[in-house]
Structures are given as structure tokens and as C-alpha cells.
Amino acid sequence: MAGVGAAALSLLLHLGALALAAGAEGGAVPREPPGQQTTAHSSVLAGNSQEQWHPLREWLGRLEAAVMELREQNKDLQTRVRQLESCECHPASPQCWGLGRAWPEGARWEPDACTACVCQDGAAHCGPQAHLPHCRGCSQNGQTYGNGETFSPDACTTCRCLTGAVQCQGPSCSELNCLESCTPPGECCPICRPGCDYEGQLYEEGVTFLSSSNPCLQCTCLRSRVRCMALKCPPSPCPEPVLRPGHCCPTCQGCTEGGSHWEHGQEWTTPGDPCRICRCLEGHIQCRQRECASLCPYPARPLPGTCCPVCDGCFLNGREHRSGEPVGSGDPCSHCRCANGSVQCEPLPCPPVPCRHPGKIPGQCCPVCDGCEYQGHQYQSQETFRLQERGLCVRCSCQAGEVSCEEQECPVTPCALPASGRQLCPACELDGEEFAEGVQWEPDGRPCTACVCQDGVPKCGAVLCPPAPCQHPTQPPGACCPSCDSCTYHSQVYANGQNFTDADSPCHACHCQDGTVTCSLVDCPPTTCARPQSGPGQCCPRCPDCILEEEVFVDGESFSHPRDPCQECRCQEGHAHCQPRPCPRAPCAHPLPGTCCPNDCSGCAFGGKEYPSGADFPHPSDPCRLCRCLSGNVQCLARRCVPLPCPEPVLLPGECCPQCPAAPAPAGCPRPGAAHARHQEYFSPPGDPCRRCLCLDGSVSCQRLPCPPAPCAHPRQGPCCPSCDGCLYQGKEFASGERFPSPTAACHLCLCWEGSVSCEPKACAPALCPFPARGDCCPDCDGCEYLGESYLSNQEFPDPREPCNLCTCLGGFVTCGRRPCEPPGCSHPLIPSGHCCPTCQGCRYHGVTTASGETLPDPLDPTCSLCTCQEGSMRCQKKPCPPALCPHPSPGPCFCPVCHSCLSQGREHQDGEEFEGPAGSCEWCRCQAGQVSCVRLQCPPLPCKLQVTERGSCCPRCRGCLAHGEEHPEGSRWVPPDSACSSCVCHEGVVTCARIQCISSCAQPRQGPHDCCPQCSDCEHEGRKYEPGESFQPGADPCEVCICEPQPEGPPSLRCHRRQCPSLVGCPPSQLLPPGPQHCCPTCAEALSNCSEGLLGSELAPPDPCYTCQCQDLTWLCIHQACPELSCPLSERHTPPGSCCPVCRAPTQSCVHQGREVASGERWTVDTCTSCSCMAGTVRCQSQRCSPLSCGPDKAPALSPGSCCPRCLPRPASCMAFGDPHYRTFDGRLLHFQGSCSYVLAKDCHSGDFSVHVTNDDRGRSGVAWTQEVAVLLGDMAVRLLQDGAVTVDGHPVALPFLQEPLLYVELRGHTVILHAQPGLQVLWDGQSQVEVSVPGSYQGRTCGLCGNFNGFAQDDLQGPEGLLLPSEAAFGNSWQVSEGLWPGRPCSAGREVDPCRAAGYRARREANARCGVLKSSPFSRCHAVVPPEPFFAACVYDLCACGPGSSADACLCDALEAYASHCRQAGVTPTWRGPTLCVVGCPLERGFVFDECGPPCPRTCFNQHIPLGELAAHCVRPCVPGCQCPAGLVEHEAHCIPPEACPQVLLTGDQPLGARPSPSREPQETP
């Protein structure tokens, strides 16, 4: 009670003090009924008065609670008093009260673990238990802390006092994944130092780089994290870019030379030749000579190391002159000096003279009156001269510098046109206008034509333009000669006075003045980068721009990163360098993170959470400490526990303050739209985060949060207080890092950074045009500013410096040209001073200006011509000439006729010169004093009878012979081009050609492969040696001649032949004269026949029957008939009358061929290519010659029935059945079918030419089969190929080889039976189980059966007899079953799908794989590329599993290997695969045969041993076959290998045969 009352008393005293304070301020204390709880809305007082009454209310609440507790205790006391009053009083021992109970005297208890109490004399004496270790306190930094107390020495460390020791721990920081870290000020945990570690490389913050592992990724280091984006390759400036290792985008190939490297498009000057400019174009260096602008007429030589001459001096006559220095001149009357590359000359001053036409005396500079100068000509005093003006003759005289003239009649001169009217001088008329003799003029409408009147005839031609007096003249439209009124420079026309930039050299500023262009270098400002660049059309190099996120920034510009405004970027050297903006230090210790920097003091970031300013929150690690956020600063204090009215408070687990047991919970406060606020809880009203409220026992008190001053110049308004996370500038908000145009200053750019705005002038990129217009901020090329004036694009304006020019602005470029003028109506208009366009009020002719009507000497020919200006057109005419006194005068000075030489037929001849007369006149002329006299020529006699006079010639010449389009002279001999062993001779216009008749002059002559006649090894005959080139007659016959011919190598040799006599065509027999002594050829007593145009193409028989003559090209061409060689002796030869060649007398001896006697003269055919005949007991055979074939890829050479030579037919195909049986179709598909019946293997399904059937046998095993026999049906004939090579034809056994013409031929080659059928069918049977059927390409698309349809597509080979595709190979094979076989009617089993390896087991499959592996080994390696081995390997494994162990497995293996080798041979590859123990083939060694894997299909026999191998192979179109062959050097004859010399005699005549055949009983012609 005492305690409670004391507490109540203290509350009352405190309440009174508050009331007095409130009363002093004039307020009243409101009273509320006890037990009534006010709501949050009613308890919120307005204004400052309510805030002042707030503490009073709190104390009133506490006082009311204490009074209520006193009331309850009072009731308990009254109850105890009544109990005590009923008890008897006994003396009691003193007691103590503690922990809610009474303790007897001397009792000891512990209110807590470190405090002990003892009851003495009714009082509790409590004290600390310092002797216990865990009850000792702690002291740190001068501060004392109790046991168990938690404190924080700084914001990042939490400590606790336990048993006298302080235990501290830092904050829980996450692990960092970086190389370097740092702890920012005010933070507890370290962060990664700005920068990125990527792929083992350290990059600074903000830098942009390419990934080292993938160059197509562009990465940026932002906030210690790497962000990568795929690069977009720009379009390549070259047509063939190259992708280099380590690069993403293809680049243009550069150039390397002499240790230097240049990029594509880069230009440079070679060190040794400054005038040589080279350029790199995709790895190739192209060089050209620099074109130097003509800046002055006499520039000084280039400075050392430079190319172009300079105008700071003059180089003249091989000497250098400085500017201003005198220069020597060829004119002594002028003084010249050098002026900046030009020579300026001034005439020497002359005194005045008293005459009007003073003349110049040679050697003097000034004119004097001792002579006259008139119309550009010099005359001596007292000299008389004549002129022609306006068609009249004028006589003038010179008298002391004065000229007087008078008209005079002209003498009559011969001219082409007679004079008319009163005009006495010869005149010309052209286009209705008359011109005097010698006048020159330009006809109207033809400005580039000049005419002159000569001998009364106008002669016009193109005007010869003089050299222009300027260096860059222009050819005006419609003008004849170039003009210096404008300049043509690098194919561009510029007006006079125009300034322009050279398109080829943009760093040259040029000026056009009077047709000459002068250029000077442009001064470029210095650049701030190491590698400046020059763009197209730019003069000066500039630093490259930067491209970042598809935005362009100029060099030196600072800007915000387009995607991250927290980064500041700067463009340098074409690369954007970015880094985080520096953050200002926050004015508080725990600011909130802003957009870029942690500087928002409107709240606190503490312990990983964010709190608004004014918020109270528990300490993140000590629940007994309470923290408060005040403008970014955090203050944490230990919770203060209020005194409790109960004697025994209870400390609940997890709580910081003890509580009275069963004490009623303080009343909470309602919150709109949320749960009730607890007692002593702070909260913000909904929608008003800037106010802070406190709930105390159901009452709510609120106040506005205070705002600290913002540490920035332009803060924006935050939720409650101004914030530096952004800017408020001129009424607009901007994000931190944002750039924006200044709203107050034009052309300025502002940056918002952490609440402050800074503005600076906008950076401008240099304009890409020479005359940019003034833009709003920067110059742009949308218009032009020219000489201080602004113009719009496409606007025309007058040139401010040249009133006659008109300029055009186009995209910042200004082009000025001459103002267009109307074309004048005259040929030589004049531009008066102050005017822009020409007029016809005067004339300007070749730099000379004259008034209308004025006459002056022609500037082009001042000696011989005068010109007059007539209304803007100059009319020029030649001065008159005196008449010539000779009939053939030549032109003299001024083209006047003189008699010093002769002019004949348009050519001038000197006096006394002799020359030919006119063409065809046959005259010889002579020039004498202007007169020409001619006499007729006399032709010399010719020694030939045939003479011809050509057109244009005077005299005839001897005519030779024309042969093969070439003329040969009379008596010449030559070898015709088409026959090297013939000789032709020309005699009296007749060409006679015959084969050279050879004779021998030695015992052993030799004949080379290219010699026509045999030669003797040396030039010696009958003991006499002859020199090279010497010829002689070897015997008494004058027609025989020998010649000693030199040889290219070795000594000379002797060649002898009979002379060739010319043909005496047309000579009558009565006029034939025999040859005289020592003469060889007869002659004709009269002239031979002439081959005229009427006889062209006709033939004539000469007296010699060995010649045939034909009239060709006006020449008789006589050819000697070739006689065949005779086999009979000379004694049995005779020449029939009227014949040329001898023949053998008919013999009676017969021939024996193949055991058959043949009569002499009888002929027979061996095969389609070879025919034989019997002559004089000898068999002669002749074979047809076949031309070589060139077939396409889908065709091959093949023989048709009845033909000798092959022709191009579709390529043949083959089908094979082998093993257990596997079928490879014509189209290449491999099938497996094990039926043991008879089946159609291949058949001609269109015309029924053939049908091949196979009969399979299971050999006593179930589910397997092998080919047992083959039946070939040819019409009515049936051929069966049985086991062990047996063959029957129509049921009868036959011996091989077997021939039944013309259909069938069967032979045995080795162990293989080969059947040839007339339609081109071929069947190969090994006598065991393998059969191969080959058909020519003509059967493409016509076959059916197990071999398929031969249409080139393997996918549709499973077609049954009805033409339908069947679903399985077993169904397909069964559909072609036929009812026949080895034993008709025997039982057979249909094919089904089986797998013999599954039944045989794993071991059998493994052994089969091992043995069949030879197909994939080296013996067959060359074939793998052309024939895949996998199908054959699978078939081989299948067969070995089916065959089982033993010798049958060896046969199955050889079948599969032989099948694969056969396909390899057809593909052109011959594998060598047989070995001593692998599939050995035996051949009859006793008959000389050996085995050959790829033997010739047409072996060497006695009948074809003389045929070249290449021709023999070309005739036998089948590829090589394995079998028994004769070794090299032996030939086959009657199944034996014998030497060629042991063959019987067989004579072959005619052309060389290509494919001679053996006897019919051995082998017929092979067909594919």
C-alpha cells in the first residue's frame, strides 16, 4: 500500500505541476469521465495548444490507473483487517516481503541470477553477487555495462556484456565475387571496388570493350557488372570484305608493303617519289601520279620532299629566278621580271613620231618614219604594194611613214568559174553570197567550218583552232574553238572569277580567272586526337565521332549514357569512355538509395531495411533496443521500462521489460482501413506519410515530421521533404543524370545531377559543307552563308563579286556560273564593258576587238588575209595574187600561183623532176618551168607464152599457175599441203601433181617415219662424194635424179627419185615430141590448151592416161592416179591398153581358210567389220576404220546389231544376283530375297526380245536360298546355264565356245560363262551362285523383274507384274515367281523375311563381321569413294550367318567379295584383293594362261596382234574382266598362248582395223 500510495502521491504532485504550467499559459485542463476511451479522431487536438496538453493527458491517464489500483488494494486491506480483528494477538517474528511473497527472518532469496536478498529485522537487504563470474559487469571505452547488456560502439558493431567480458560481432555481409573491395563511408559492409573482372581481365567502371572469347559481343562494365550485347556489323564499304581471326565483322583487306600497313581506302605518298600517290583497295595497291594544279605559267621547281611546283619564283630557260628578279627575254625591246611564277614584261618607252604609219626597222625597238606598217605588214619607204578590199583591187604606196591607196582594175586570171557582172576579179558563190578570190570566211550556221575561195571554187574545211592563251579553256556549246571566258578543270566548268573547292583534292581552294585555274592549300585547324579522319568531300581532317546505343556524339562532347543516366560519358578518339558520376557526400549517416547515389535523407537505410524519417523501429540485432530515424540519421537507445505497480512483476521470455501478472493490456487505437495500433505504437495516417502519430492507452497524438534543409540547389519535392534525387528546374522535374535543353538560354545544354542543375553551351560538330548556314545553335547544311549573306537551299542569287555570274545554293555548297545569255545572231560577238552578254555591235576575233565596219589583218594569217567586222561577224578574204604565166603553176607564198614548180594531178613536182603520168595512161612526164610534157612508155618483151595485163598496169607480165588459192611462178616445183609425198610442177599454166616415185641408189637404204623415200646414209655414189645440195643422175635414165640433202642432226644423206613430167593437156597426139637426148619429158609442138573462164570446172583427158586434169582458178590442175601395190611378181604384171596401173595376170591358185578351200578371187565376210578375199593363194582381210567417239556423261559407246562401229547410246546397266541371294537392280538398289522357286530376273517387257529366269535352291536348309541355274529365253531358243559351267541349248548340252549365228555366242573365260545375245544382252554366270545381267542403254525403261525397271530411280524398283509398288521385298520377289525350274513341279518355298544371324547366334555374327571386314579394309579402299561398301558388307554378314561354318562359308565370302569387286570394275576402279588363301582362281598353266583381275575383254590373237592397243580397246567397249589371260609377249590361238611369230600367215590390207575378230568359233563381237 505504501508503495502504491507513494506512487499515487508522486503522480498527483506531477499532475499539479503540469496543471500550473498549463494554467500559466492560459489553457484549461479538460476532464473526461473515468473509464471513457476517446477515439483517435476525437483525441487529436488542433494546433499548438493541443500539443501542450498532451503530456498532461498522459499523466492523468497514469494517475487514474494508480487510483484504480489503490482502490483494489484498499479492498484487500480492508478484508485482511477484518480477518486480523478476529484473531488473537501473539508475538510474531519479523518477516520480509519480496518476489510477491513473505520471507521469514533470516531467509535468503534471489530476485535474479546476480542479486541476493536477506531478510534481517523485517527488512530485505539485497545486493549484487560479485563473487559469481557471470554476474560481473563490463567496462569499455570508459562506459560501464551490466551483465547481459547489449550496446553498439558504432553503427556497424553490436556488443554484449557476458560474465564480465565484452563479445562483439560485426554485421552479416554477403560474400563478394570480385578481386578488390572497399567499404564506403557510412556503410558497414564492403562492396566491390568500381570495375569488372571479366574473362580474366580487369576493366574500369564505365569502359566498353569486346569479349575476348566472342568478338561479336560488345560489353560494358556498369556498377561492377558486365552487360554484353551482340554487335551489329555496319555495311562494308568494299565488295569483298574478309573476316579476320579475332574479329566479328568482316573488314576490307588492308595492304602491307615494306613493313608498313595501310587500311582499305587509305591513301599515302611514297617516300621516294612525292608525286606518286598510292591507295589500298582490298589488299591491292594502286598508284597514280599526282596531278598538280597549274597555279602560274612559270612556277619554280618543287621544294625538297614535295611534288608540285610553287609560285614563289620562276623557272625559265633552265634557270631559277626569285620573285621580282629580272628575267631575260628574247625581245630586246621589252623589260621582263619574275612575279610569283609569272613573267611580266613592259615595252621600252618610245618617243612620239610625226607620221601615222611608222614602220619598224630590224634591230631597232621604236618605230620610225623611214618605213610603213600597214595592216600588219612592213613596207619600205617608196615601196608600192597591192591590196584587195571588198572585192576591189587597191594600189598603195609608202612615203615616209604615210600610206596612200587608189583603186585599180585587176588583171584577168584563169579560174574555174567565169567572172560575172562588173566584177573583174575571180569570185566564188556559196549559199547565195559572193566572195572574192582568196577570201577566207566562216559560213553562217556552221561555226566550226572555214572556207576559202580558190580559182573561183569555194573550198571548206574544219577550222584549225590556235592554242588558247590560257591553261584551262572551255569549249562553249555551239562554239568552234575553246574560249578563255571560263575554266574547265577536272571535267567541271567554272565561271570566270568563281572560287571553288577542287573535287579531287578537297584541301585545295581554287579560283578561275580568264581561263586559268589557280589553287592554294586550305589551312586546317589543329586537331586534338591522335588519328583524325577525313570524310568524303571534307578538306580538313577532324576527330571521329562516337556512336553509342545508335546515337552519334561529336569528339570531346560529354554526355549521359543513353541507357544509364548515372554514367558520365565523353567522346574521345571515336570511342565513348563512360564511368559512374561522382556522388556528393550525403549530409546524413544512413541515407536512402537514390536514382544514382545514396543521398536521400528523407529516410534511413539501416540493417538492410528502409524507414521513413521519424519512424521508430526495433534494432535489427537487439530487440531490447529501440531505434529512431531522424532525417537520415539513426539513433538507437535501450528500451526504458516503466515502473510497475505490482510487487512481483514477471519477465516473459522474449520481452525486454517485466510486466505485472494478469495486468490488463493497455488500450489500443483504431486506424482507418488497418488494424488497431498497439499501445505506444507509432504510425502514419493513411494518405499522409508526412505526419507521425503515437498511440497511448487508446489516445492518438500526431505531429508533422520536421524536414532538414536540402543539400542541393534544385531539389525536387519528395513525398514529405525536398529530395536531391532529381531536380526541379524552372517548374519542371528532371531525373538525376538527365540532360535537357536550357529553358532560359538558347544553345545551352543542362545536366541534372543529384538535385543540382548545371548548364553549358552546346557542342557543335563541324559542318560537312564549305558554306553552312547559321542554324538555331550550330551551323547546318540545310542552307548556305556566302560572303556574309544567308540563302536557302536550291536558291539562286547573283554573285556578289561578279555581277555576270549566277550562284546556286545546294546543301551548303555554292556553285557559281556564268549568267545564261541569249545566243547572238552573229559569229564573233563582242561583250562591251559593263555588260554580261555579247552583242553584235562589234567583233572580237581571236583576242582582237574591232568596231563594226573596221578592216584589219587576219590575226591568224596577217600576211595573206584581211578581215572586216560586219555587224558582229568577221569576214576574212585572201589578198589578190598576180597571174601565173605557165599552164601548171604551183602554189607559192599566200597560195599564189608561181612557175617555180609544177602542180599535176594534185601533186607538186620540182622543176626538172620526172614522174609517171595519170593512172592507166602509160605515160612518163617531166616538169619544166611550170609546164608538164608526157610521152608513152614502151613495154619490154616477155619470155613466156602466157601473159596477163593487170588492171592499172601498162605492160603485161608472165602468168604462172594458181593452185589451192596460191600463185606459183612458171617452172616452179612445190609440195602440196595435203600430201607430203607428192610433188607439183607449173608448166605453161598447167599444174601437174603426182606422187614421188622413189628409187634406191645403195644396197641398204633407210626410211624414217616421216620420209617419203628411203635415203642412203651418206652422199657417196660409185666412189664419189657429193656436197650437200648437189644433185646428179645416178644412171643412164635421164628421169632419175639424186640429191644430197643436209640433215638437222648427223651427216647429210642421199635421196633419189624419178623426175616428174608436166602434163601436156590439150596437146594433139600428132604434136607430141619425144624427149631428146639427156631429156626426160616429152614436149608439145604447139601451145597447150588454155583454162579460160568458160572451161572452169570441166575435165580434160591428157595424152597420159595416169593423169586427170580439171580447170580450176584459170589453171589446169592435173593429178596423177595412185596405183595400188601388187602382190604378184613383176613377171606376172601387165598394163592393159589405155590404163595407167599394171595388174596381175589372173592366177589359178586357191586359198585355204579355217580348213575351207576358197577359190582365187572369192570374197567373204568374217564379221560386220572384217571382209576377206583370196588372191593368188593368199588370204587378204580388210577391216573398216571407225572414227573416235565423244559421248556425254549419260551415254556410252555401244554397238548396234549389224553395225561395225560403236555409236553413243544410253549408258548400259547391269544387275547382279549373288550370295543368299541378294539382288542389285539396274538402278543400284540392293534387295534380299530368299525364295527357293523360279523367278523372272530380267525381262524385256515391251517387245519381248529376251527373258532371263533364275531358279533358287535352299540346299537343304530352311529360310535361305542360292541361285542354282539361269535360263535365257531368246525368241524360240532356250539356253540354260547350269552348275559347274554346263550349258544346254534347247535341251541339248553344247561344248564351249558355242556360236549360233546371228543370235547367240557362249564362251568360257576362266570359270565364268559369258553369254552374248544379238539384242545386246550379256549374261555372266560363275557356275555356282552368282549371275550378272547387262543390257545396253537402249533398254532404259523397258525392263521388269527382280532387276527392276531401269528408269534411273531406285525408289520404284519394287514394282510387281501389275505395275504396283509392293510393300516388302519378300512380296516383291514372290510376285515374279514362274512355274519352271530345274525339276518342274518340284516343291519350293516362297520367300519370307528372315534374319539368319539371329538364329545363328552372337558368335556367328561376330565371326561374320570379322571375315567380311575385308570389304572395308585397304584392298578395297580405292573403291569406297565410288561404290559404298556398306550394302555389300551387310549382304556378306547375312550370307556367312546363313552358310554356317566350314568350306561353304568360304564360298559365300568369295561370292560377296567378287560381287563388290565387279561393281568396282564397272565404276573404273580395279581392286587387287585376292590372296594366296583368299578366293584363289586357277588357270591352265600348262597352256600358258595366268589369272588377271582386270584382263582385256578382247585378248590379243593371231588375227588382231598388229592392231594398236588403244584402237583395239576403243572397239571393245566392254570394261576389263577377271579371268585367265596370256602373259605379255604371247597371243592366244586355239585356247593356247603362243609367240606371235608362231601364228599362221594372215595378210591384212586396207585401212588399219579397229577391232579385228578371232575366228567365229572363238568369240564374236562383244556388245555391251
UniProtKB/Swiss-Prot annotation:
Coiled coil: 60-87
Residues spanning the signal sequence: 1-23
Domain of life: Eukaryota
A Gene Ontology cellular-component term: extracellular region
SMART domains: C8, VWC, VWC_out, VWD
Comp. bias intervals (Polar residues): 35-49
Domain VWFD: 1213-1389
InterPro entries: Kielin_Chordin-BMP_Reg (IPR052424), Ser_inhib-like_sf (IPR036084), VWF/SSPO/ZAN-like_Cys-rich_dom (IPR014853), VWF_dom (IPR001007), VWF_type-D (IPR001846)
Name of the featured protein: Kielin/chordin-like protein
Species of the source: Homo sapiens
Lineage: Eukaryota, Metazoa, Chordata, Craniata, Vertebrata
Gene of this entry: KCP
